[in-house]
Amino acid sequence: MANSSVYADVIVVGAGPVGLFVACELALHDVSVIVLERDADSDNVWKKGLLGGRGMYKPALEAFYRRGLLADLLYDEKRVTYLEKTSGFQYAGHFGGRLLNANAVDFSRFKYHLPGPTFLPAKTTIADIECELSKRATECGVRIVRGVEISRVEDEGDEVTVWADNQSFKSNWLVACDGGKSTIRKAAGFQFTGTDSELTCYIAVCDVDKPELLGKGMKPTDAGMYIVSGPRHLYVMDFDTTFDRSQTVTKEHLERVLQRVSGTSVKIEALELVSTFTDRCKQTTQYRKGRILLAGDSAHIHSPLGAQGLTTGIADAFNLGWKLASTVKGYASADLLDTYQRERQPEGAWTLDWSRSQVVIMRPDPAGKAISRLVTEYMATDDGTTFFVNKIWGISRRYDLVGAQAHPLVGCSVPDFQFEDGSYLGSKLHEGKFMTVDFSGSKLLEEATDLVQPWVGYLSCSVKDRLGMNALLLRPDGVVAWVAEDEVKVDSWKAALSQWIVLPGEA
């Protein structure tokens, strides 16, 4: 017999980076949260060091930065805020193993991409992210329950019940962040569609007899690609999907694959760790079904080519957290939660297409090689490099905000304006509120903002370059919802705000 139910406003399933970020966002807004995690221990070799290494691009960096977590996560209080170009090569990313030179990027094309702590990508590990987010979640009162296996979930219309081991948990909402094989997604009947794999990929910690034959870095070949990322760390991507991934990868099998893909006679002398993955690309057709929502790999899976997975998942969490909190607290506009799917599903679909297109240029057939030559030629130009780096880094990502003001900055992440004292706007957004940013010195917006406290903050400041703007309204995730370039009109500001929350007297 099950024990009496444990209740929270929201249940989050999965204590990885996405689930923990959602939990922290909810708790920031005084929403009670329980996180249920299958693994009893967060310590895992695949989350640490080179094996756990992940790239983070602008959307994810901004999420951590705007909640005061970036410096601790990167162990870097004085992060480089701009790219100093050199005469040689500076790595900016890759597309299907074809490298991009940051020195060829024309950053002048990105008016709103200002120097600051999120200007450049960064590297971290899953272990470090989980450590920092777990600390923040605990400080905010989130309860994390580890070592529980979910057996059933039921959306009962006005609440959700989750059964895990000999315990039931009830909440008003459930957010599934439990990975690509999501138990919740399957149990709740979400459709998950897309394309099957063309590649079988191996990641290994091993010793080889002649490492000089392999070299270092990314190596596209006529049979796929391999990557030597460290003295003993190896990735091999093979256009052969006949291997049964439920079987153990032996040293002999991996050696045969490595020799075929690399075109060398290198031998594996010792195999310490090995795992496999594929390039399957699938996405749920709905991000919300009743009171159950999906985020991160629960909503979309793809190969790790281009290192977009972590950024896409954290961006899901950042977009969803404040919207769900507003809904729980009762001040959300009627369709606020619908905007989560409206904004994030296209981003997930783009990530899948970005992954698929890289596989295409890696194909060993004549068509794949022809496309590869064409893409590589374009990437070698300044225009091509600028295009690819913009896409990979997420510099000019923009949400199409229905009914919003027609301005090129509306729907974009707010520029990281630098104040006269040297600080940046991103460091002023830690409370996760809507924010009126006023460069005009007018009292009108301050008085209007006072009427909608505590949901909206007000910041009057002098910045080094206001980019022709007098005032802005920011969502809690830092997305621009309204801009005043000339006269500041309070009615226009109020109309923009009312698209997201119910203003006092309008309920």
Swiss-Prot record:
Function description: Monoogygenase; part of the ergochrome gene cluster responsible for the typical purple-black color of the ergot sclerotia. The ergochrome gene cluster produces several ergot pigments including the yellow ergochrome secalonic acid and its derivatives, as well as the red anthraquinones endocrocin and clavorubin. The pathway begins with the synthesis of atrochrysone thioester by the polyketide synthase (PKS) CPUR_05437. The atrochrysone carboxyl ACP thioesterase CPUR_05436 then breaks the thioester bond and releases the atrochrysone carboxylic acid from CPUR_05437.
Top-level enzyme category: oxidoreductase
EC number of this enzyme: 1.1.1.-
Gene3D superfamilies (alphabetical): 3.30.70.2450, 3.40.30.120, FAD/NAD(P)-binding domain (3.50.50.60)
Coiled coil (UniProt feature): none
Induction: Expression correlates with the formation of the sclerotia and thus the pigment production.
Pfam families registered for this protein in UniProt: FAD_binding_3 (PF01494), Rng_hyd_C (PF21274)
PANTHER family, sorted: BINDING MONOOXYGENASE, PUTATIVE (JCVI)-RELATED (PTHR43004:SF19), TRK SYSTEM POTASSIUM UPTAKE PROTEIN (PTHR43004)
GO terms of molecular function: FAD binding; oxidoreductase activity, acting on paired donors, with incorporation or reduction of molecular oxygen, NAD(P)H as one donor, and incorporation of one atom of oxygen
Name listed for the protein in its UniProt record: Monoogygenase CPUR_05431
InterPro entries tied to this protein: FAD-bd, FAD/NAD-bd_sf, RIFMO-like
SUPFAM superfamilies in alphabetical order: FAD/NAD(P)-binding domain (SSF51905)
Cofactor: FAD
Pathway: Pigment biosynthesis
Family: Belongs to the PheA/TfdB FAD monooxygenase family.
Alphabetic keyword roster: FAD, Flavoprotein, Monooxygenase, NADP, Oxidoreductase
